[in-house]
Swiss-Prot record:
ATP-binding RNA helicase involved in ribosome assembly. This is ATP-dependent RNA helicase DRS1. The Q motif is unique to and characteristic of the DEAD box family of RNA helicases and controls ATP binding and hydrolysis. Associates with pre-ribosomal particles. The lineage of its organism: Eukaryota, Fungi, Dikarya, Ascomycota, Pezizomycotina. Residues 710-721, 740-756 have a biased composition (Basic and acidic residues). Its main location: nucleus. It catalyses: ATP + H2O = ADP + phosphate + H(+). Residues 21-34, 78-90, 98-108, 172-195, 204-225, 240-252 have a biased composition (Acidic residues).
Amino acid sequence: MAPSQKRKSLPDDDFIHTISDNDEPDILDEEEETVPAAVAGRPNKKARTAGAGAVKGKKNKKEKKGKKGGKSAAAGGDGEDGDEEEEEEVTGLWGANDADDGAMDSDFEFVAGGGGEDGLSGFDEEGWGFENAKKGVVGAGGAGQEVKSGVDLDEIIRRRREKKKGKGLEKVEEEEVEVEDMGEVDLDLDDEVLAEDGFGMGMEDGEGGVDEEDKGGEDDDEAASDNDSVATPVQHPDDEASEDDDEEDAEEEARRKEFFAAPEETENVGKKGGLSSFQGMSLSRPILRGLTSVGFTKPTPIQAKTIPIALMGKDVVGGAVTGSGKTAAFVVPILERLLYRPKKVPTTRVVVLTPTRELAIQCHSVATKLASHTDIKFCLAVGGLSLKVQEGELRLRPDVVIATPGRFIDHMRNSASFAVETVEILVLDEADRMLEDGFADELNEILTTLPKSRQTMLFSATMTSTVDKLIRVGLNKPARIMVDSQKQTAVTLAQEFVRLRPGREEKRMGYLGPYLQDPVHRTSHYLLQAEEDCSPDPDHLRLAGAFEHRAPWKHEPGSAFRDGKVNYLLATDLASRGLDIKGIDTVINYEAPQSLEIYVHRVGRTARAGRSGVAITLAAEPDRKVVKAAVRAGKAQGAKIISRVIDAADADKWQDQIDEMDDEIDEILQEEKEEKQLAQIEMQVKKGENLIKHEEEIHARPKRTWFETQEDKKKAKELGRAELNGVRDAMKKKGAGRLSNKDKKKLDSKAERSESKSTGWKKGRAERDGKGAVLNLKKVTKPKSKAPAGRKGRR
């Protein structure tokens, strides 16, 4: 460093300049300004060698300054004598009296924000903990401030409630309390364990047909079976194909054996290390300290099997139940390998891709906390955060980049300082979702750009084993690690099903009412299938104290829910994958999902990491097939399955109360519309001012490019939505939310054709000609029936 060079160049009898001398007062400030914010917490050699003398060094500085001032005053301002006296007390460059000169970042202050001794004391209460993501948000006042939303619907509701408090609404509140008490009694009396003849039961381990209903005979059973065949939901393409391992195609099984690494290799790696604890995995001390500070004392099964294999650099395809610690399973080996990286030249070596930005934020939080005792740098690149801030972080070439596919491609194409040629590890979290059609184009663009010699790891709770999909990722003899059977829920999860009789599907909110006021379920997480399907319901639930899940750093419903300010969190399938929200005891499916895979992800938001939880599903007659699949999977693992019956009269009372909110909701929506218009006008005015003020800078910016057109992006979005929610959701728009029997039969036949890989079904001549076999058959039979009539007429 500069001080040591000055000591060698100057003679012994001359005074020595130090960093605290007045003749060079700006050296420290310049060094602090040039150090980037991302590197501020990085320990260095100086910090490691300073030790406990840092505190003493500061005290000695003050004493030196005091002595220097006293001597200079006594000598009439002779600075040289003061400096010579100061030099006599210095024992060495890094001695006890010169331990911390202020020109370094202390190793004991690398955790920003405090919290506890290790900065992680509040980990259990923080949940997502995306404070680092907030730093990248640019608001009206610049970087580091939160984005101010244009219109806050919850604030409008609060204002209306405050106005009504002064108008004598105490009587209404008393009536609501009485209704709440009635609902609790009925709810407790109707709880019963799901019987063999209940809705969704009667499914033996080896059977897949429709059995008898609650009280029906043979006639009722035939009608129910016919209704089931007409109104069954569309399954995921891989749902039926992978439902039973015994029915798998022999050819596909042979391809898997050739594609995946031999199971013996995986088992041998697991047996070599004592995997009952993290200490037996030969992990470095900084990694062990990070695991201990977070509260990880014993590896989960997926962690015990994955970490040793990932440390060897092999490709991994991993699957385990929700809440089993899959994130730490790939973060820990990544951190361990990065500890031995060359540090002279900063290089981006790891890329983690997630399907949603909320999951990316959570993964970033977990990784930064596990790496809190290391010098590994992370960057979060997701939509909704400032591009400029992210470009600045990527310019420093962080070790790990956690991103969503769209924003990663944006930086890859338009950020000149961001290079991906040195990436050594690629991780796809929730890989089965990433391999769907909605992400196909983006994932292909990323995979063709990254180096082919990389290590690739795929993880999901419903991991696909289809070789055709996995080949796209470019895996090289991956180790297949499936800890639990696929589509399996946690053992500590109790599953409840509320049956909606035919004709009562429109009164779902009435059946949901008792749960809104049930004190047993004061912390509930509502997952709705799609926003369009429940467009009026979010407003009703807001009046009941619920929040709709949006970007957490904007509206922060997760923080309000976690802090107990609200009791309900309304969310779509966007939040059904991967998110670990603290405090969720109950998950309520307002509508049954389209497939068992989505059901497993939804109910996996509770009963995580060994905790207990409850999953409640409001199931109508068209949901029978999914319910039976869920019940069968639950029975196979010994889970508790309950059938809950809510009296129709009570549901009607709740529905009437909810319908009374319609007028108030219309007024709220009108007020929201007016505020949105005002916010839009303000934004346009601000935009015009910026165009005039920064015209030259705006025109000087290079135009951002994309690898596909807007039409291609729209098609990809529609494909992703269709695969997530099923084709049935798109066809509902034709019949105002209802499907005709003809459309239902078309969808069922399409679902059967999608199962051709396992059943061996092939298109016939009629299908190849573009006409269905049934339609072609009708054309053939018509001439035969009309021919005799024509001959009689001629005679």
